[in-house]
Amino acid sequence: MKTLLLTLVVVTMVCLDLAYTRRCYNQQSSQPKTTKSCPPGENSCYNKQWRDHRGSITERGCGCPKVKPGIKLRCCESEDCNN
């Protein structure tokens, strides 16, 4: 009985870990903070900053995109790390 219970606990832990998704901030510039659960397998968050005629623009989200020259990009791999 103890072996069965231990097996169920281990299986539950493994299944819960497989369903884990990264959470990142996704608000733009100075808008109120919001978060998003990333798609399965997406383990990083990004914070992208640039300047244009409106001033400093910030974009946040899941992943680590490629950017053009002149755009500052910071990628990270912990919960809510891209603020």
Swiss-Prot record:
<protein>
    <recommendedName>
        <fullName>Short neurotoxin C</fullName>
    </recommendedName>
</protein>
<comment type="similarity">
    <text>Belongs to the three-finger toxin family. Short-chain subfamily. Type I alpha-neurotoxin sub-subfamily.</text>
</comment>
<dbReference type="InterPro" id="IPR045860">
    <property type="entry name" value="Snake_toxin-like_sf"/>
</dbReference>
<dbReference type="InterPro" id="IPR054131">
    <property type="entry name" value="Toxin_cobra-type"/>
</dbReference>
<dbReference type="GO" id="GO:0090729">
    <property type="term" value="F:toxin activity"/>
</dbReference>
<dbReference type="InterPro" id="IPR003571">
    <property type="entry name" value="Snake_3FTx"/>
</dbReference>
<feature type="signal peptide">
    <location>
        <begin position="1"/>
        <end position="21"/>
    </location>
</feature>
<dbReference type="GO" id="GO:0005576">
    <property type="term" value="C:extracellular region"/>
</dbReference>
<keyword id="KW-0629">Postsynaptic neurotoxin</keyword>
<dbReference type="InterPro" id="IPR018354">
    <property type="entry name" value="Snake_toxin_con_site"/>
</dbReference>
<keyword id="KW-0800">Toxin</keyword>
<keyword id="KW-1015">Disulfide bond</keyword>
<dbReference type="GO" id="GO:0099106">
    <property type="term" value="F:ion channel regulator activity"/>
</dbReference>
<feature type="disulfide bond">
    <location>
        <begin position="76"/>
        <end position="81"/>
    </location>
</feature>
<keyword id="KW-0872">Ion channel impairing toxin</keyword>
<feature type="disulfide bond">
    <location>
        <begin position="24"/>
        <end position="45"/>
    </location>
</feature>
<comment type="function">
    <text>Binds to muscle nicotinic acetylcholine receptor (nAChR) and inhibit acetylcholine from binding to the receptor, thereby impairing neuromuscular transmission.</text>
</comment>
<keyword id="KW-0732">Signal</keyword>
<feature type="disulfide bond">
    <location>
        <begin position="38"/>
        <end position="62"/>
    </location>
</feature>
<keyword id="KW-0008">Acetylcholine receptor inhibiting toxin</keyword>
<keyword id="KW-0964">Secreted</keyword>
<keyword id="KW-0528">Neurotoxin</keyword>
<feature type="disulfide bond">
    <location>
        <begin position="64"/>
        <end position="75"/>
    </location>
</feature>
<dbReference type="Pfam" id="PF21947">
    <property type="entry name" value="Toxin_cobra-type"/>
</dbReference>
<dbReference type="GO" id="GO:0030550">
    <property type="term" value="F:acetylcholine receptor inhibitor activity"/>
</dbReference>
